[in-house]
């Protein structure tokens, strides 16, 4: 019998696949897209089958695959094609690409079933007495048992019945039985839901001072008063929300103990039951979902043009540019509705994990609370949760996927629409191999699957808006806020003048302090943005001027007061806070700069009665922490929310009337040609969080550089003015969208090797410099040492991306010939940062 082969992509830093032989007993299960366990050198690795070649090289010794891990292919043919495109475009190892595309390897339970076919039925019915002439006894026994069991048997029962796998395979090859695999459902996690009992509630509430056998002694005195106050707050919450709520949310929003709620249940004041938890659902959802608005003229026109694109039945990219609060989400939801009505599926990408919960909630509110067709995919899910969601999508149990960057690989079939919300965000760019941009991959996937790609933003990237103005993308514009609500008033606080007046370098100006006080007096909410984590940026010595540096990176360490230690935000290195300067032993060390932790502390000092929380990576390390804080703020349990840039993206806080930006200068000072763009985008986005409800909003931007055009245009929320000024700068300096960029970094823990290899690569680049491409470097990277590795950087510019691709492919081949390890060379195509 001829041997069967398969090409397997392995997660190793090599730009090739590996050929393996398929054992006879596994041939029925091996097909493109399945994960397999294979021997590789002296160990076993998990890989994905990408194709089945007819023959293999006769020179090489072909080893056999060891095991098929998923009998149902994890990747569709379209995703395999997309993976090869990513590997080619981003010059990434193909195995690393497919590793990024796949869900976590978890032991999902499957069941193998044996089903008799119509041909098998016909054979048994027509020749019951002569089967023995052609079939073995165990084959006849299997066919008879299938007939007796209505045509279906679990494969696990065959061995007990004395039927061999050989007999099963022989019947399957003759078309008399089929072998099918299905996923076994796991028991779902549940959560407690509580609601207020309305019948005779007042009578029961008054009697709660009586004995409750389930809870022990009756309450008296202050304990009774405290319980009655807690009962009142719970009742007000549940009645004002007009519906049941998850117990964790009730505990958070009204700040009551679990034991108090249990006593209310025992007193029959509350009714509770268990409901399954869907990973797509936010258990801290405060129940708010904006109602469907009557569409304004701009929204009508945008939807009309989206429908027209659907009617054409062909690929296209549309850029939905709308001011903050203009109703882009409603356009998204109606576009998804149109897609589902056409029996197709939809994919929604969002830049932050927290926004997956919010967008999933919008879908549920729009399509109905019991709509089970929404799946979520993001890194905060556990491996098991992610795998379950992935297979829900793969098995067509979910028709809408909401997720962050990696959700672009969701195995949806019949894909009709891909939405990329806040398409300009850097978080769509992967920082590790493979260094793909989720937005650009989404566009390519839409093209491959003949779907529509809808990019949305209030501050589009210069590249996307340039494509829209030149006709490559179709521009859809939402020019006004929903219900004609006014944009927030944006004011600049000049910190130079503030210092001259107060002679203090406080992070909270007098104007911001007064604005927060006014918010508290009115009972509305305030957001305070500080785009730095920690307590202080660095620890400096007043004697010698040295800062405390990370042992692994060329970067100052950040002081975190709540943990009383220094941390590197790049490699995670931790050190004790020094009492003396590590360099000169001076005792005159001080903390320089303020981060979100210090600003939170200042606000607590200024407003001791205010309810304040902080939202950054330090306070939201788990999915639950995200949900608790956002749920509490949205539900009105907090007055002030301090946070980093994650606050600026997409959230719809109805009661926020003030946004304060502690410093607009941090991003502007970065050594990056996109610094102005990032500053304008962040300021405009965060300004859009104010005044989204019925109350008017106000934004205060603190800066030492109020004259900069990025700040001036953000002040007016004038994207078109900023686009024109920044485009002129990019055209003059030869930056995107007028050229394509690539960065090559040579790295090693040994400085001499890093220098030698970068020189060898420079020798390859030198003859090409000036011939359709400009090559700068090698030079020490802005972060010259990172995670113990020394880094040298080349910057390549060309009007034609194909020139860069060809040149860089040659450079990688040159590295291979000169024995420069693959792991020592990073290629970043279309970088979003030059750091």
PLM regions: where:
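Inter-lobe coupling/hinge segments of SF2-like helicase ATPases
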Residues: 290-296, 300-304, 313-755, 767, ...
């Amino acid at each position: 019998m001829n041997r069967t082969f398969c090409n397997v992509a392995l997660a190793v830093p090599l730009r090739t696949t590996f050929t393996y032989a398929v054992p006879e007993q596994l041939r029925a299960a091996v097909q493109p897209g399945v994960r397999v366990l294979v021997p590789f050198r002296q160990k076993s690795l998990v890989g994905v089958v990408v194709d089945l070649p007819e023959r293999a090289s006769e020179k090489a010794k072909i080893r056999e695959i060891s095991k098929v891990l998923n009998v149902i292919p994890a990747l569709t043919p379209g995703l395999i094609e997309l993976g090869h495109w990513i590997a080619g475009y981003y010059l990434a190892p193909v195995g690393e690409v497919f590793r990024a595309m796949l869900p976590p390897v978890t032991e999902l339970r499957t069941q193998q079933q044996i089903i008799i076919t119509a041909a098998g039925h016909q054979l048994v019915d027509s020749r019951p007495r002569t089967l023995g002439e052609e079939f073995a006894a165990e084959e006849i026994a299997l066919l008879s048992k299938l007939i007796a069991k209505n045509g279906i048997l679990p494969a696990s029962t065959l061995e007990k019945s004395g039927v061999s796998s050989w007999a099963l395979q022989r019947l399957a090859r003759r078309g008399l039985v089929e072998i099918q695999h299905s996923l076994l459902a796991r028991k779902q996690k549940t959560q407690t839901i509580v609601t207020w009992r309305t019948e005779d509630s007042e009578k029961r509430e008054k009697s709660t001072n009586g004995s409750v056998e389930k809870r022990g002694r009756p309450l008296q005195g202050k304990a009774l008063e405290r319980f009655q106050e807690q009962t009142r707050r719970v009742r007000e919450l549940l009645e004002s929300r007009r519906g049941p709520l998850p117990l964790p949310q009730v505990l958070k929003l009204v700040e009551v103990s679990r034991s108090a709620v249990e006593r209310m249940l025992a007193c029959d004041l509350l009714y509770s039951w268990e409901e399954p938890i869907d990973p797509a659902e936010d258990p801290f959802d405060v129940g708010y979902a904006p109602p469907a608005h009557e569409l304004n003229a701009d929204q009508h026109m945008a939807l009309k043009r989206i429908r027209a694109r659907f009617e054409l039945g062909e690929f296209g990219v549309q850029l939905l540019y709308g001011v903050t609060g203009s109703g882009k989400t409603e356009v998204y939801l109606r576009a998804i509705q149109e897609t589902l009505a056409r029996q197709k599926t939809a994919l929604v990408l969002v830049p932050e994990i927290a926004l997956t919960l919010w967008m999933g909630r919008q879908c549920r509110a729009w399509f109905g609370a019991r709509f089970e067709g929404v799946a979520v995919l993001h890194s905060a899910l556990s491996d098991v949760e992610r795998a379950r969601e992935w297979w829900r999508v793969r098995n067509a149990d979910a028709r809408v996927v909401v997720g962050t960057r990696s959700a672009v690989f969701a195995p949806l079939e019949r894909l009709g629409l891909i939405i990329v919300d806040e398409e300009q965000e850097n978080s769509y760019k992967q920082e590790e191999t493979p260094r793909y941009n989720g937005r650009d991959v989404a566009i390519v996937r839409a093209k491959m699957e003949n779907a529509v790609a809808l990019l949305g933003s209030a501050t589009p990237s210069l590249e996307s808006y340039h494509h829209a103005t030149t006709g490559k993308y179709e521009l859809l514009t939402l020019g006004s806020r929903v219900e004609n609500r006014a944009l927030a008033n944006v004011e600049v606080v000049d910190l130079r003048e503030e210092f001259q007046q107060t002679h203090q370098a406080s992070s909270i100006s007098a104007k911001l302090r007064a604005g927060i006080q006014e918010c508290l007096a009115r009972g509305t909410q305030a957001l305070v943005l500080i785009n730095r984590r920690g307590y202080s940026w660095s620890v400096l010595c007043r004697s010698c001027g040295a800062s405390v540096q990370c042992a692994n990176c060329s970067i100052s360490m950040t002081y975190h007061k709540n943990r009383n230690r220094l941390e590197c935000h790049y490699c995670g290195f931790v050190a004790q806070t020094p009492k003396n300067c590590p360099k000169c032993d001076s005792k005159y060390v001080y903390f320089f700069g303020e981060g979100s932790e210090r600003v939170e502390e200042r606000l607590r000092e200024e407003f001791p009665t205010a309810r304040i929380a902080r939202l950054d990576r330090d306070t939201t390390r788990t999915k639950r922490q995200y949900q608790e804080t956002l749920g509490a703020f949205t539900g009105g349990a907090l007055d002030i929310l301090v946070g980093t840039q994650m606050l600026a993206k997409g959230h719809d806080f109805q009661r926020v009337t003030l946004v304060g930006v502690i410093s607009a200068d941090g991003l502007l000072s970065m050594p990056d040609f996109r610094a102005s763009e990032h500053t304008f985008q962040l300021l405009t986005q965060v300004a859009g969080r104010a005044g989204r409800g019925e109350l008017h909003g106000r934004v205060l931007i603190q800066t030492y550089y109020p004259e900069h055009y990025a700040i001036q245009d953000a002040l007016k929320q004038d994207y078109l003015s900023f686009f024109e000024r920044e485009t002129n700068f990019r055209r003059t300096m030869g930056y995107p969208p007028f050229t394509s960029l690539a960065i090559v970094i040579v790295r090693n823990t040994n400085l001499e090797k890093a220098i030698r290899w970068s020189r060898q690569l420079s020798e390859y680049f030198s003859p090409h410099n000036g011939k359709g491409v400009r090559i700068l470097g090698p030079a020490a990277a802005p972060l010259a040492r990172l995670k113990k590795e020394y880094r040298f950087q080349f910057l390549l510019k060309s009007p034609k991306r194909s020139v860069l691709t060809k040149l860089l492919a040659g450079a990688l081949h040159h590295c291979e010939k000169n024995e420069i390890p693959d792991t020592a060379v990073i290629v970043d195509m279309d970088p979003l940062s030059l750091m």
